[in-house]
């Protein structure tokens, strides 16, 4: 029943469980009773959670911050769809917050956009902000756009995740994943809660086989970036391009790239050659691979936490993470509205607590 049943899955199934299941396993080792019970595909608030929420959160030392990628929510990750979630705006200062652990990302993005006059659209990354460290595919977009604003923000309030730092804005030429920052509550402060230390980074992580990590950069050219008339081209080489469509998966683009090279269908002049893909061609190749590693259950399930009640000003919502299924006849799912996140409303000051007349009183 419940969590215990999950923990008895065969060994090969463990490899395909998602981040949330590992969170449950880690908590299972921390507590003597289960963190939650899964019933009707819904993770219910457990007695442990209620206990922690009632009177045990005495210091932010008990919080562990985790970056969660939006692609786990089933949002469309192709470049045309993803870029529609971002927009330029002035008058809002950028915010940066750190997080301690995160997921590996299937899709990351890297933008180099200029205005028509040649000036830069995006600010350079401040000192200490490095690219997201674990991306299977990096979608590198170069091009031009009006860029009507000082910074590029996420229209739905999510963060841009960098290397253990999450920012509200996009930095020039710095790889990021879309996500939010969540907090795990521990019964007491634990320094060694995350037992796996960060991998020792080789000089070039993408080529060192010992790192067990491989990343592929896919290049695009954009015109009218950030407008409703944006046009994207997938770059085969500096003179050969393919018109980009939302239905193209990274695996399909890589196969397309290989086909252009081996079949000799590249530009052999000084002019630009642009190909268009036949609408009847199935482009869903490889889409299952990512979701096999991300899936948690075959149906939707919700994760509830008392943290949402600490500084809640809007109606309470649950964060829903769902596996997206694609049939052979379907293209990628349309852009989904991500849940408005209360995670960003949690103040990051220290809690100062004292016991007065037998009651725990905390102030910020």
Swiss-Prot record:
The record marks 324-325 as: Cleavage. GO terms for cellular component: extracellular region; host cell membrane. Residues 1-32 form the signal peptide. One of its GO terms (biological process) is monoatomic ion transmembrane transport. The keyword Secreted applies. It comes from the Viruses. The keyword Secreted applies. Keywords: Cleavage on pair of basic residues, Disulfide bond, Glycoprotein, Ion channel, Ion transport, Secreted, Signal, Transport, Viral ion channel. This is Pre-small/secreted glycoprotein. It comes from Zaire ebolavirus (strain Gabon-94) (ZEBOV). The gene is GP.
């Amino acid at each position: 029943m419940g969590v215990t049943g999950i923990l008895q899955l065969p060994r090969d199934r463990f490899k395909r469980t998602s981040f949330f299941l590992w969170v449950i396993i880690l908590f299972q080792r921390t507590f003597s009773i289960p963190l939650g019970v899964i019933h009707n595909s819904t993770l219910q608030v457990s007695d442990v959670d209620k206990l922690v929420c009632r009177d045990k959160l005495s210091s932010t030392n008990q919080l562990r911050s985790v970056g969660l990628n939006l692609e786990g929510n089933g949002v469309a990750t192709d470049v045309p769809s993803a870029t529609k979630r971002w927009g330029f705006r002035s008058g809002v200062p950028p915010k940066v917050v750190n997080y301690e652990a995160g997921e590996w990302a299937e899709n990351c993005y890297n933008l180099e956009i200029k205005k028509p006059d040649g000036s830069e659209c995006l600010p350079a990354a401040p000192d200490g902000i490095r690219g997201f460290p674990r991306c299977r595919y990096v979608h590198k977009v170069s091009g031009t756009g009006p860029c009507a604003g000082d910074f590029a923000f996420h229209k739905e309030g999510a963060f841009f995740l960098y290397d253990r730092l999450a920012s509200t804005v996009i930095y020039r030429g710095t790889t990021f994943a879309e996500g939010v920052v969540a907090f795990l509550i521990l019964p007491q402060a634990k320094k060694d809660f995350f037992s796996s230390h960060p991998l020792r980074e080789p000089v070039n992580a993408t080529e060192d086989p010992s790192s067990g990590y491989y990343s592929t950069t896919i290049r695009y050219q954009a015109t009218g970036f950030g407008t409703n008339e944006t046009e994207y081209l997938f770059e085969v080489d500096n003179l050969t391009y393919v018109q980009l469509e939302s239905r193209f998966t990274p695996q399909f683009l890589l196969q397309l790239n290989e086909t252009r090279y081996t079949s000799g269908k590249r530009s052999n002049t000084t002019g630009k050659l642009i190909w268009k893909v036949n609408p009847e061609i199935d482009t869903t190749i490889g889409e299952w691979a990512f979701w096999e590693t991300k899936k948690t259950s075959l149906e939707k399930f919700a994760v509830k936490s008392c943290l949402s009640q600490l500084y809640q000003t809007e109606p309470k919502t649950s964060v829903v993470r769902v596996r997206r299924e694609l049939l052979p006849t379907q293209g990628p799912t349309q852009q989904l509205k991500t849940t408005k996140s209360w995670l960003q409303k949690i103040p990051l000051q220290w809690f100062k607590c004292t016991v007065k007349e037998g009651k725990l009183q905390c102030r910020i």
